[in-house]
Amino acid sequence: MSLVNKRAVAAAFGRAAQSYDSHAQLQRQSADLLLAKLGERRPASVLDAGCGPGSMSRYWRDAGAEVTALDLSLPMLRQAQSQQAAQHYVAADIEALPLADARFDLAWSNLAVQWCNDLGQALKSLHRVVRPGGAVAFTTLASGSLPELHQAWQAVDSRLHANRFLAEETLAETVSAWRGQWGIEPVTLAFDDALAAMRSLKGIGATHLHAGRHNTPLTRGQLQRLQLAWPQQQGRCLLTYSLFWGVIERD
């Protein structure tokens, strides 16, 4: 797997900061799933690691928690701050948190650790800042995500147009270093056409490729081939994600 260019990732999400919430269907669904896995926990202090524009920071704040919103992207943090999503804001990398040990009841990270170079280091970092009795709750993407995108692009060229994610076995092995639970669930979204499906990826900042990308614009003919090759259901273009979730207990 290619190393992640953190500055490029931050820039991609920064460009998407203003439109992120309107495109973030996947983030909302994965957050709902992770909340269900947490059950009746009521953390008094929460780290929202990879907070984006702050929708979940706001959720935890409204639930009565003291929230620290953390993101690699300054524009995303500014967006969160403009919404008064949290009480504290930190620009930092999840793999190297500049935070004290045992500070939070919950370290929450929804669809952010896939942008880390080392998942084990990211989870170790999150685990470190959680108090005994607390938890790390996270979601990420597993291999097998975006099969429709890969299939459609094969009708146009042989280049890579989406990042490859870690296998379920690798994710599970990493999480097994701690006490907790994990699972994987498919999430399928539907869009009016291929262009809307691809814009949903761009709109959440997720079009940055770790291996680099070609910036040649799509021609009309290429877009037509994409549309014809894209798997559809009832006339709508699908995007399927393999969503991996984990809840790690802090003993």
From Swiss-Prot:
Gene3D superfamilies attached to this UniProt entry: Vaccinia Virus protein VP39
Domain of life: Bacteria
Keywords of this entry: Biotin biosynthesis, Methyltransferase, S-adenosyl-L-methionine, Transferase
Metabolic or biological pathway, per its Swiss-Prot or TrEMBL entry: Cofactor biosynthesis; biotin biosynthesis
Entry's Gene Ontology molecular function annotations: carboxyl-O-methyltransferase activity; malonyl-CoA methyltransferase activity; S-adenosylmethionine-dependent methyltransferase activity
Coiled-coil features, chain-numbered ranges: none
InterPro entries: BioC, Methyltransf_11, SAM-dependent_MTases_sf
Reactions the enzyme catalyzes: malonyl-[ACP] + S-adenosyl-L-methionine = malonyl-[ACP] methyl ester + S-adenosyl-L-homocysteine
EC number(s) given by UniProt: 2.1.1.197
Keyword Hydrolase: no
Physiological role: Converts the free carboxyl group of a malonyl-thioester to its methyl ester by transfer of a methyl group from S-adenosyl-L-methionine (SAM). It allows to synthesize pimeloyl-ACP via the fatty acid synthetic pathway.
Protein's UniProt name: Malonyl-[acyl-carrier protein] O-methyltransferase
